[in-house]
Amino acid sequence: MSMFCYQCQETAGCKGCTSRGVCGKTSDVANLQDLLIYVVKGISIYDLKAEEAGIKNNEVNKFIMDALFSTITNANFSREDFIARIKDAIGLRDSIKDELVKNNVQIDDIKDDCALWKGISVEEFEAKAATVGILATENEDVRSLRELLTYGIKGMAAYAHHAYNLGYENEEIYTFMKKALVSTRNALSVDEMIGIVLECGKFGVDVMALLDKANTETYGNPEITKVNIGVRNNPAILISGHDLKDMEELLKQTEGTGVDVYTHSEMLAANYYPEFKKYDHFVGNYGNAWWKQNEEFKSFNGPILMTTNCLVPPKESYKDRVYTTGAVAFEGLKHIEDRKDGKAKDFSEIIEHAKRCASPMEIEKGEIVGGFAHNAVLSLADKIVDAVKTGAIRRFFVMAGCDGRAKSRNYYSDFAKALPKDTVILTAGCAKYKYNKLDLGDIGGIPRVLDAGQCNDSYSLAVIALKLKEVFELQDINELPISFNISWYEQKAVIVLLALLHLGVKNIHLGPTLPAFLSPNVAKVLVENFGIAGIGTVEDDIKLFLGEA
């Protein structure tokens, strides 16, 4: 076994990748990611001490966010990048340690190897990385809870990173991330670990609320919008991922250049924000969910900007047109450097590249509708409440989450098609691509698929549910006519799940498979306490959700 990773839904055999990631990452990159997380735990140990002593270093929180974000699925495949990050991590960790010593803060009690180990050469990194991975925790249940928490924190870091880019921060979130990381190094009881995992859900709600505030105060509340999925005849740039700050700067820099901009996958949600609608060269959305990019990036013809995950190892036919930025990296791809001294990123190279390219090849035409975030949906609250009271809407189905390659995910398309006509789907994330182009009709003018936006906009779905609970004067969110049938893929879906559990949501169905990182005993706890379940057949599940089983 040259690596071990089981953080995503597509992990080999639903057990773990041991020689190469299904995602495409090599074993050495997987191991270096483990080592980076290990050293970041050491940083966290010292920085919590520094916080207690009133010593503040603003660089630390950003570094931890970046490091965690770089290790999520389909973000960073670069060996060289992780080697550089590990060197920086050791340097930062030791600088915090030195500052503590200088300020006469007692650190003799710190004995953890992750706070003390020093490596200089790549060979030392690789040797150490082989010893600090997931399987270094021998007890299966302890390992399961530690990894569940770690993946939740990774998702949290991604959302905090986007908010940070827009100038929004919450120190309590940063402190929790560090405390949670340190907790994975301590010999805690199972009950204590479960408590921290559930606390992670609380901060998951907080970080999604922070990002929602950042996005809406910066770009306006998402509006119900018809989005063009066809093409024009101009050269263009395709922007993928989730980072709206990158979107803003790209639109500003392409204005007046003759280069159009299209969104891809979860960046579709940018079409819903009022601030972006003023750009005439912002055409619409091209393609589908992330996993189809091998074909769609080729047919797009122009350059592609990957702002965050999900990147698939690119094919030679279009590799020279893919640019990365932020936490994303892949050997051989051009990388656009981060902002410095308060200035915008420089997108001039990708813009000039676009001018030399043919216009996108049409792969579909027409429009799709989205923008049903909490502000837009709550403006329809009276209409929705009336529809529920009259029986026009029998039930809502939250089908947020991720899409992926597995054929078993066709379940979600089939499920959407088979739902009775008096039901409405609430969605967010790229899971929507399984049904957002189906003609499922409407109920009294309310579309039967209400897309709130990106995966973090699952927060909107929670806000909507809580508002409906208030309107209907219910004591418990689970009394609402809402069922949760969520598809997951990576670590941002984990923090969304933990956030829902914190809000008291029960009987969530999770698929297409339950996470490999849930040991039988941990899965049993989630089933018994929260009613977590997997998926069955479409017919059986619909009967179960509608109380007809």
UniProtKB/Swiss-Prot annotation:
The modification Cysteine persulfide is found at residue 402. Its cofactor is [4Fe-4S] cluster; hybrid [4Fe-2O-2S] cluster. It is found in: Cytoplasm. One of its GO terms (cellular component) is cytoplasm. Catalyzes the reduction of hydroxylamine to form NH(3) and H(2)O. Pfam families: Prismane. SUPFAM superfamilies: Prismane protein-like (SSF56821). This is Hydroxylamine reductase. Binds 1 [4Fe-4S] cluster. Hybrid [4Fe-2O-2S] cluster binds at residues 242, 266, 310, 402, 430, 455, 490, 492. Its EC number is 1.7.99.1. It catalyses: A + NH4(+) + H2O = hydroxylamine + AH2 + H(+). It comes from Clostridium novyi (strain NT). Belongs to the HCP family. [4Fe-4S] cluster binds at residues 5, 8, 17, 23. GO terms for molecular function: 4 iron, 4 sulfur cluster binding; hydroxylamine reductase activity; metal ion binding; peroxidase activity. HAMAP family: Hydroxylam_reduct. Signal peptide: none annotated. One of its GO terms (biological process) is response to hydrogen peroxide. Keywords: 4Fe-4S, Cytoplasm, Iron, Iron-sulfur, Metal-binding, Oxidoreductase.
